[in-house]
Amino acid sequence: MPRALWTAWVWAVIILSTEGASDQASSLSCDPTGVCDGHSRSLNSIPSGLTAGVKSLDLSNNEITYVSNRDLQRCVNLKTLRLGANEIHTVEEDSFFHLRNLEYLDLSYNRLSNLSSSWFRSLYVLKFLNLLGNLYKTLGETSLFSHLPNLRTLKVGNSNSFTEIHEKDFTGLTFLEELEISAQNLQIYVPKSLKSIQNISHLILHLKQPVLLVDILVDIVSSLDCLELRDTNLHTFHFSEASISEMSTSVKKLIFRNVQFTDESFVEVVKLFNYVSGILEVEFDDCTHDGIGDFRALSLDRIRHLGNVETLTIRKLHIPQFFLFQDLSSIYPLTGKVKRVTIENSKVFLVPCLLSQHLKSLEYLDLSENLMSEETLKNSACKDAWPFLQTLVLRQNRLKSLEKXGELLLTLENLNSLDISKNNFLSMPETCQWPGKMKQLNLSSTRIHSLTQCLPQTLEILDVSNNNLDSFSLILPQLKELYISRNKLKTLPDASFLPVLXVMRISRNIINTFSKEQLDSFQQLKTLEAGGNNFICSCDFLSFTQGQQALGRVLVDWPDDYHCDSPSHVRGQRVQDARLSLSECHRAAVVSAACCALFLLLLLMGVLCHRFHGLWYMKMMWAWLQAKRKPRKAPRRDICYDAFVSYSERDSYWVENLMVQELEQFNPPFKLCLHKRDFIPGKWIIDNIIDSIEKSHKTIFVLSENFVKSEWCKYELDFSHFRLFDENNDAAILILLEPIDKKAIPQRFCKLRKIMNTKTYLEWPVDETQQEGFWLNLRAAIRS
């Protein structure tokens, strides 16, 4: 029994292991190019079965703990390997030995406590290596990177345990585009540890305290282009002039990100600008100034300028003691050489007039996302303020009057570019005043609903996107670029208003079509962006857009952003792919063909009706339907006549002088119905015929050549035919007044023809001796 349980347990383990491997393999998705994605799949190991076809493998954000030398041995063509954000604590020595084509390796944020140079000894083409966020204290006993001659981006260190940097750590590296060192708790920095790197484009240092900052600067100041300091408290920073005063420097840019200053440490940083003379650009991003701006008591007055700094950028500056902050007048003299200033999202509501006047070299000023209003702008743009300013950005402030803002900026004689977007102007006055050299104006997202002559005629670039505009009818003779997306325009602007326009972006309006003629009217247009509109995919529009091979060179967002909105059966399709039927595109031709076909059909029907007496059938059908409304057969008491006599007018002498005399003068007399005598005046003649036939016991047809040719006799014959057909009786009496060919009787009167073929008809004898017998037979036929 125990042996059986043991066997069952072993089989269960094997099955579960197989299922686990199968689940892991299925959780890895690969495309035909060899890019495999296993990101965030809860994997606890590297999936098996990886082959040489894998070129990119993303296994980040899983639960992998171990990398063996067999896991990746078949991935000889692998170029990108992402193993970040796992639980890896062990990597075997030869785990990456077969990855000779690897260019990108990410092992960040794992649990590696020791690093080995053997991991990288075959990675000759590796360009990117990220080792951030692991548990190691140092970069190993030997040089990790000596076998990586092509490495360009290196990220090392962590926020807690990494405490030492030694001289051997970066041996073998000569050029790096980016080096990031996370060393918040750095305690030991051996001098010249970074000096072996001959050139570093961008160095990112995470240092909690600035104790070793100057030592690091001494080593890199001659080989570094950009230094970025992150997450540092500079309260105790002190700059020693002697340390780098005699050295050549190559640093051009300093970035302080999430750094804390005091008044004192800020002065020390300003000193650094003077002694590291190559610095041209300084950026403060998300920094905190724990002071009140009191620099007078410090040595700042002995510093005459900010070195060679030309560009100053400040974003999200936080000043806890903002309401105690002083007027900064002590730093005014330092700003004379600055050409570009950006102070963004820092609650700036005023630039003092005196400071504006000291910024004599300023060419670019960006005060976006602050609290500037017309009242404070009046003080900032005072006389002699910013004398060389060319570009002013006041995006997302508290400006409300377009007219007043333009008037306040008249002091800026050299201003040619103004961005006042994301302010709530709502409307535009009819006239405005602007600096005379204005060439570029940004009024996007200002909620304006119409454009007026307020805009300067000197404009070359105009941005009025994301507003409520429904038309554009301004004449701007010098405008070269127009940005008018996200409005309510229904058509392209008139080209005559914009004679030199070269770039137009008019996407996401309510334009439903445009034509070749419209585009050709913009003679200098090189770039058009008109996607995101609700296009009516008419035949003309599709023919134009699909037939112009050069259209893609003008429409920069063609074809992916151009979709049909109608007709409904192509809605959502790309304009390039939409197809319409022949009837939709050639409606006139189809209608003409249909009309011709209908005409031919009607003509054919007319011929057939004539040939087969269709008109007669329709007339008879109508009359028959009218007659059907009456009683099917007249009751006996409604019979008024013994016989209705149908005859030709030319045979009236025989009927009226012979037949009437013989029948109505006979005893007992017969009552005959004659149309001349008995038809009701004013009544429709067809109704008279129908009523007379129905009120007569018999119908006598006096057949002759004249009868066959008579139109009304035909009607009487027709209705008699219907009566014979409908009532199935023998009410007809045929009298041949003169010999007549049976073929003269129309073929459609089949029953009457049958009567003539199957019954004896009465023939008027020429011989007078036989006429008495004729009348006798006629009287007998009427009585039958």
Curated annotation (Swiss-Prot):
Parts of the chain on the Cytoplasmic side: 609-784
Residues covered by the LRRCT domain: 525-579
Main location: membrane
Highest taxon in the source lineage: Eukaryota
Crosslink feature (Glycyl lysine isopeptide (Lys-Gly) (interchain with G-Cter in ubiquitin)) location: 754
Listed Pfam families: LRR_8, TIR
Subunit structure: Interacts with LY96, TLR1 and TLR6 (via extracellular domain). TLR2 seems to exist in heterodimers with either TLR1 or TLR6 before stimulation by the ligand. The heterodimers form bigger oligomers in response to their corresponding ligands as well as further heterotypic associations with other receptors such as CD14 and/or CD36. Binds MYD88 (via TIR domain). Interacts with TICAM1. Interacts with CNPY3. Interacts with ATG16L1. Interacts with PPP1R11. Interacts with TICAM2. Interacts with TIRAP.
UniProt note: domains: Ester-bound lipid substrates are bound through a crevice formed between the LRR 11 and LRR 12. The ATG16L1-binding motif mediates interaction with ATG16L1.
Protein name in the entry: Toll-like receptor 2
Upper taxonomic lineage: Eukaryota, Metazoa, Chordata, Craniata, Vertebrata
Gene that specifies this protein: TLR2
